[in-house]
Structure formats: structure tokens, C-alpha cells
Amino acid sequence: MSKLSYQEVLSQIQYGLISSCQPVDDGPMDKPEIVSAMAQASVMGGRSGLRIEGVDNLKATRPFVNVPIIGIVKRDLPDSPVRITPFLQDIEDLANAGADIIAVDGTSRPRPVDIESAVKKIHEMGCLAMADCSNLEEGLYCKALGFDIVGSTMSGYTGGAVPEEPDYQLVKDLKSAGCFVMAEGRYNTPELAKVAIEIGADCVTVGSALTRLEHIVSWFANSVKSAR
């Protein structure tokens, strides 16, 4: 898409659905051409934006869609629990591949690059910055640093058992604090996604329920088995 202003990108995704096209790692659908096809199908279905993991996947998708793309890189590091876009080089590569928004881990956990440097680099590359946070304190800190979007992405994923329900309270609190809020994390039905907007989210990201076929099939298979 042509380079839009920050406000134009936010306007395009506001009150809309973001499709996170991230297949199961090393699964049969974990191929750039398939990710691109999923992204194009998502746009045809009415998505306002996309979340794409990996530079190769982003490069394969960008020429075929006109909606804003949130780009991330996931890494498993030996010395940090932070996985989402941990390095400045990741930010540069995503921007050069065509991301409009770049998301990074916004938690307070130990990280290889300080978050202040990350948001600065994202803006230097001409992209909007999104922080994937786990609680209100992190979200407020990231907002103060200049992040354009604050997501509830990491709520429930920084230790302990993962809750079944989305973190509605975090979405409400972030919105009350004046953040542009991305509801993300366990919004796996149309009804839950609708609630996210109703309680104040500016937009909502859905992933597994849309693009991870292995997960979707397992939900149905397990439900059928439980009937016997």
C-alpha cells in the first residue's frame, strides 16, 4: 500500500478486525506462499488489517494486500523470555519488508534491547509502534514512551496457567488511560471479538480461530469425542 500517515493507518484499523496469519510453527501451512494466501483470503472476508510474523512471510504478503500490516518477528532466545521482535535489526527488516506497524514485546521482563531503543527505532523507520503488554502498568509505561498502539496481547502469557477468557478488564483500563487499544489474546469467537469493541477496544486481533487449522480442527474433534 502507499505510505500512509500514522493517523491514516490508525483510522483504517479502528473498530475493525485484525487477522493474525501465523500458522503453527513447522506445520504444513508454515510456508510464505500459504501465509500470503491466508492473508489475502482474510482481506476478502472483511479484515481491516493483518498481523504477519516473519520477514519472508511479510515480503510474500505485502504486494497482494492494501490493508495495514502489523509485522513481528518471533525468536526463542536462550537468555530472555521475550520472543516478539526482540532486536533492532528485526525492526529494520520488518520496516523494509513493508510493515506499517511493528509490534514488540512490551512486558517488563528481561530483554536483549531496551524498549526505549525499540520504540525509537520503529519511529525512525517510519512505522507505527505497538507494544504487546501483559498488564496495565506495562501499558501505561509504553504509552508514556510514545507507543502508538497498546495491546493486551501478553496478558495471561507471562507465567502460570493461561486463562480461558480474554482480559476484558485490561482492555477497559487501557482505554480509560487514553491508549489506542488493541484487544488481543483468546478472542476466539465472533461474540468475544464483538465484546472487545463494545467495552472500548479500538480494534481486535484474532489468530488461532481464523488461521491455525490444526487448532480449529482439534476443537471440533475434541468436542465430538466428548459426546461419547
UniProtKB/Swiss-Prot annotation:
GO terms for biological process: carbohydrate metabolic process; N-acetylmannosamine catabolic process; N-acetylneuraminate catabolic process. GO terms for molecular function: N-acylglucosamine-6-phosphate 2-epimerase activity. Keywords: Carbohydrate metabolism, Isomerase. It holds the Pfam family NanE. Its EC number is 5.1.3.9. GO terms for cellular component: cytosol. It comes from the Bacteria. Pathway: Amino-sugar metabolism; N-acetylneuraminate degradation; D-fructose 6-phosphate from N-acetylneuraminate: step 3/5. This is Putative N-acetylmannosamine-6-phosphate 2-epimerase. It comes from Haemophilus influenzae (strain ATCC 51907 / DSM 11121 / KW20 / Rd). The lineage of its organism: Bacteria, Pseudomonadati, Pseudomonadota, Gammaproteobacteria, Pasteurellales.
